Amino acid sequence: MEHSRERGRSSNMRHNSREPYENPSRSRSLSRDPNQVDRRQPRSASQIRVPNLFHRKKTDALIVPPAPKDICPTLKKGFLCDSKFCKKDHQLDSLNDHELLLLIARRTCGIIESNSQITSPKDMRLANPTAEDFSQGNSPKLTLAVLLQIAEHWATRDLRQIEDSKLRALLTLCAVLTRKFSKSQLGLLCETHLRHEGLGQDQADSVLEVYQRLHSDKGGNFEAALWQQWDRQSLIMFISAFLNIALQIPCESSSVVVSGLATLYPAQDNSTPSEATNDTTWSSTVE
């Protein structure tokens, strides 16, 4: 009897001694001791929040549309073009795989000798020209009249042998003259460009995008990107086409502007037959 009572007492003592460790959360008080120091682990460097103000802005390179290509039909047929009067594009990158393989096959057989000229690379310093590259010297003031004289002069020149600094300056001239056009006339400028170069409508989007981005270009960033990413031959073709058409198409389409400026046209002058005919046609359209 006493032995069973002692055994029951010892089991109760073991149970009571084990009870505080069953649930440790019970022993924690809800009220925090004010004298207790809160020792938290310091945040790692990856957890520290940095204000967005100090994040450096990412500046990606400008995406330039592909240059319009008018591939030489002789080259597309697999023959090397040896004509000195052909003004089409002769870049082999413009050919598809079939046309390129056909050209290689004919070339390796020795049927046609190559007379193609390899264009020299552009001076990439001129993508962002400095004052030394375009020193003004004693040049006249750049008025609208001077811009037109420069455009008329270079519209009739062959640009294939021109030096890089002048070609870069002509690209700037095209950008400046493009901004003299009304934004509504950029579509007409694109259509005239396609007709002048004999390009298909599949090239219209690229040409129109170039004119639109030159028109809204701030700081010459897109102009510099064109110089960097287009090859020399594409730049020459684009500049030549622009200089030939820019002085021939209207720069304004607003009927109010056109009718208002038409009244300011000088009176008929019979000094030369060409001027007289031009005045006659103008006056007839105005009336």
Curated annotation (Swiss-Prot):
Q: Where are the zinc fingers (C3H1-type)?
A: 72-90
Q: Where is this region: Interaction with the nucleoprotein?
A: 180-197
Q: Does the keyword Phosphoprotein apply?
A: yes
Q: What's a Pfam family this protein contains?
A: Transcript_VP30
Q: Can you cite a GO biological process for this protein?
A: symbiont-mediated suppression of host innate immune response
Q: Does the keyword Acyltransferase apply?
A: no
GO molecular function, a single term: RNA binding
Where does this polypeptide localize? Virion; Host cytoplasm
Keywords in alphabetical order, please. Answer: Activator, Host cytoplasm, Host-virus interaction, Inhibition of host innate immune response by virus, Metal-binding, Phosphoprotein, RNA-binding, Suppressor of RNA silencing, Transcription, Viral immunoevasion, Viral nucleoprotein, Virion, Zinc, Zinc-finger
Q: Where is the composition biased (Polar residues)?
A: 24-34
Q: What is known about its processing and modification? A: Phosphorylated by host. Phosphorylation negatively regulates the transcription activation. Phosphorylation and dephosphorylation take place in viral inclusion bodies and are largely influenced by the presence of NP. Dephosphorylated by host PPP2R5C; this dephosphorylation enhances viral transcription and is mediated by NP.
Q: Which Gene3D superfamilies match?
A: 1.20.120.1160
Q: What does this protein do?
A: Multifunctional protein that acts as a viral transcriptional activator. Promotes read-through of an RNA hairpin in the NP open reading frame to enhance viral transcription. Mechanistically, nonphosphorylated VP30 hexamers form a ternary complex with the viral leader RNA. Clamps the RNA template and the complex VP35-polymerase L together, thereby increasing the polymerase affinity for the RNA template to increase transcription initiation despite the presence of RNA secondary structures. Also assists stop-start transcription at gene junctions to promote transcription of downstream genes.
Family designation: Belongs to the filoviridae transcriptional activator VP30 family.
Q: What is this protein called?
A: Transcriptional activator VP30
- Organism, per UniProt? Reston ebolavirus (strain Reston-89) (REBOV)
